[in-house]
Structures are given as C-alpha cells and as structure tokens.
C-alpha cells in the first residue's frame, strides 16, 4: 500500500503518543502484533508494541564485518533522527549511486578511519566512482592536470 508523502516536524511530534497517531494514520492499533505498518524497512510498530526499534532491511548474514556495518548504519540513522528537527521523505536521484551514498554516510558521521570498513561493506555492491560525482575528466582541475602531464612528456 503506497501512502502519501508527508513532512514530520519536532513541533508536531513532541511525544510518542503524537508520533503513534501519525504512524497509524489515526487508527491506533499498537496492540496488534501483526499490524500492517510493521512491514517497512524501519518498523516503528515495534516501538509502540515492544518499546524497541526494528530494522527490516538487511539480508541475513553471519559475516561479522557486514553485521557491524549494518549496526553502525542503524545507529547513525537513529542518531540523526534524534538530533534532527524535521524531515521530508523524498527519493534522491543520482547518476553516481556510489558517490551519493558515500557522501550521505559521511554526513551521517560515518567518516574517518574508524568507519572505513563500514563504508567499504555498505558501498561494495554499488556502481560508480567514490571520489567523483561525475566523470573525473570532466572537472576543470583534472583537465589542467592531464594537460600538464601531457606537456611534460
């Protein structure tokens, strides 16, 4: 079931009761174990039913590095959600998924040597260039470097 896009703000959701009303679209049914709202990547039904957040968006694996990367991603997203005042859900369009996702991970705070393996695991299956949004030869600075290298030869 596709639901309409909406904006959530801190003023609108000052406590869990208000968030619960928004999550269930007015039909508060947190007592139902198999509520339809639990089948999303982020299951907030679990918050109202059990008091825990449940992420339902990762493939099963026993690889310790991948599991740690998934946990780090969930913690970073949760931290941003707590600190952020408002949010708008919208699809991001990108010609270079690898670059776009890497930039988002860095914005979440998953930067530096500490999260190198986390980024490696999360970016492993994406196509594109990590460092350059567009073809690196299209940037003026790279054109100058390439030209000077050719002149040296």
Over which residues does each language-model region extend?
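Long, charge-rich alpha-helical interaction segments
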Residues: 8, 12-15
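Non-Sec secretion/translocation targeting segments of pathogen effectors
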Residues: 147-153
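Long, highly charged low-complexity segments enriched in Glu/Asp and Lys/Arg with interspersed Ser/Thr
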Residues: 112-147
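Extended serine/threonine-enriched, polar tracts that run as long, contiguous segments within proteins
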Residues: 19-83
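Flexible helix-coil linker/hinge segments at domain or subdomain boundaries
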Residues: 79-96
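Short, small-residue-biased leader/transition segments that mark boundaries at the very start
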Residues: 1-2
């Amino acid at each position: 079931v596709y639901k309409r896009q909406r904006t959530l703000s801190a003023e609108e959701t000052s406590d869990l009761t208000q968030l619960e009303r928004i999550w269930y679209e007015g039909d508060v049914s947190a007592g139902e174990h198999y509520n339809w709202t639990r089948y999303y990547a982020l299951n907030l039904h679990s918050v109202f039913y059990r008091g825990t957040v449940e992420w339902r968006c990762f493939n099963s694996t026993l690889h310790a590095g991948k599991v740690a990367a998934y946990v780090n991603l969930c913690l970073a997203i949760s931290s941003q959600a707590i600190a952020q005042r408002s949010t708008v859900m919208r699809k991001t369009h990108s010609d270079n998924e690898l670059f776009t996702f890497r930039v988002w991970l860095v914005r979440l705070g998953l930067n530096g040597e500490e999260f190198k393996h986390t980024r490696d695991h999360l970016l492993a299956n994406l196509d594109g260039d990590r460092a350059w949004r567009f073809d690196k030869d299209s940037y003026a600075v790279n054109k100058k470097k390439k030209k000077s290298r050719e002149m040296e030869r």
